[in-house]
């Protein structure tokens, strides 16, 4: 697969069911290892449902962008402005709330393409920085974000089933 054959664009409302299926699969690929199965199930049944995605899709300040290959969603990012941000709540910032690529397509530059899109959205909107939260045990993602210029600037608790995990907060300033 060549990255040039992947279309990157805003998600359309009719694509939410396909996006949810892809998001569930990518989440399981990324977070099954190292987590209790019941916590993974609990979180997925709360955060990765069509109803929840529809609510987020309609929310002021949230946008979804998808990476599409041969009509199939293989990656996506969700960006948030105030009032939809999960933390920070700084009108001069843009949050990358989610960035996932299916395992079969990792290492092809799609994550960077989606992150670059989020950065360009932040700049176009006149934001001073872009930030995100990443699980402290997700070494691959942390390396990816560091390689792309983000730096850890703090942490916050992340409720996950019956435990509270720690997410590093990372940002890049413009």
Please identify what each model-predicted range represents:
Residues 3, 90-94, 128-129, 135-142, ...:
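C-terminal "cap" of GNAT-fold acetyltransferases
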Residues 5-7:
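Extreme N-terminal starter segment of soluble prokaryotic enzymes
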Residues 10-16, 21-33, 41-104, 115-117, ...:
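Acetyl-CoA-dependent GNAT
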Residues 71, 75, 109-111, 149:
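Conserved phosphate-binding and hydrolysis motifs of nucleotide-dependent enzymes
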Residues 100, 150-151:
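Short acidic-aromatic loop segments in the C-terminal HATPase_c
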Residues 102-104, 108, 136-137:
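Active-site acidic-Proline motif in GNAT/NAT acetyltransferases
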Residues 107-120, 143-147:
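Conserved acetyl-CoA-binding loop-helix of GNAT-fold acetyltransferases
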Residues 108, 125-128:
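Short coil/turn segments at alpha/beta junctions that flank glycine-rich nucleotide-binding fingerprints
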């Amino acid at each position: 697969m060549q990255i040039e054959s992947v279309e990157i664009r805003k998600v359309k409302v009719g694509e939410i069911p396909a996006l949810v299926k892809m998001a569930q699969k990518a989440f399981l690929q990324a977070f099954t290892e190292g987590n209790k199965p019941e916590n993974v199930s609990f979180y997925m049944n709360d955060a990765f449902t069509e109803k929840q995605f529809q609510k987020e899709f309609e929310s002021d300040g949230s946008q979804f962008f998808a990476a599409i290959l041969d009509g199939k969603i293989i990656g996506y990012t969700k960006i948030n402005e105030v009032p939809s941000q999960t933390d920070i709540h700084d009108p001069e910032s843009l949050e990358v709330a989610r960035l996932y690529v299916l395992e079969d397509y990792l290492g092809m530059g799609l994550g960077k393409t989606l992150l670059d899109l989020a950065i360009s959205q932040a700049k176009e909107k006149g934001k001073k920085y872009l930030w995100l939260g990443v699980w402290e045990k997700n070494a691959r993602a942390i390396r990816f974000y560091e390689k792309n210029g983000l730096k850890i600037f703090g942490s916050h608790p992340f409720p996950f089933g019956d435990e509270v995990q720690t997410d590093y907060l990372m940002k890049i300033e413009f």
